[in-house]
Amino acid sequence: MTREEAIAAGMEVHEIQHSMKRRTPWHDYSRKGTYMLTLVVRERRALLGTLCGSLEGEKGPYVEHSALGNAIAQEEQKKIHRFYPQLEVWKLCIMPDHLHMIVRVNENMENGKHLGKVVAGFKSGCNNAYWKLFNMNEPPRQGLFETGYCDKILMNDGQMDKWTRYLDDNPRRLMMKRQNPDLFTILTGMEVAGEKCQVVGNRFLLNIPDKVAVIVHRRYTNEENARLREEWLACGERGGVLVSAAISPKEKEVLREAMNRGYNIILLRENGFPKLYKPSGEAFDACAGGSLLQISPWEFHYEKRVITREQCLHLNAMAERIAGYA
């Protein structure tokens, strides 16, 4: 259900809470659906397992579960279906300091039960396993996980497949981050093209002299677009950098092709970066490989905004300055 549908149905819609663990306020969590849940260990302590393997090895990176991680995988997650038969855990991914679960609610829950109570019960079981394994017999005792949790509502099978692949790839991405920490660090207040910006990625791309600004104007003919596309991709082929805000569909198309080919890209963003930001999908690999730099002249915000014409002009002007056009 969208926000507009919720309002039309007479439901109370609250303002977005500035928290990485916010719920969708107009969704009924007692109804059937598919969710990806994320629970983070308090203080991000690596209590659930150890990252092993290598990027070059035949097995690849993987997480070897600790005794606590094993207890969660072998005992606690199975209790969810035992206590709530209408729920199934379709996927469990345990990382050293957090875990993800894809949970399917096959039937509506009744008598005041909802997903939040399911998670609370699961966390309670994990707490008991944690206290037992660490000999924490006397109160006060802290829980294993941070307060709250994050959920993502999976609306279709395509999302399910995407997030299953994402969870399977988690150990590899973590190892890449650990091997390339500077490429995933958020820098604030860095001066770029005369502005204080937030940046993530390979900052040395700014020093490459061969740069082009990928900007497509409406007045361009098909022939002009084809010629410019060829010139921009040729710059990438020779080791140069494509600079763009990727606003229009044709700009996005060029940047997507450049990323598929492994070319250097500087991407300008309307939004900044949250505290625990990391790129996803192909952008993650590009960042780890040193071929991507993301820049935003604005602070991060949680609201879903439509980029304004003024912001488009601002970012395009920045792209031209970075490319040395102005």
Language model region names:
Residues I186-A326:
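Glycine-biased, small-residue-rich flexible motifs in mid-sequence functional cores and linkers
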Residues M1-I186, V192-E195:
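Short catalytic/metal-binding and nucleic-acid-binding patches
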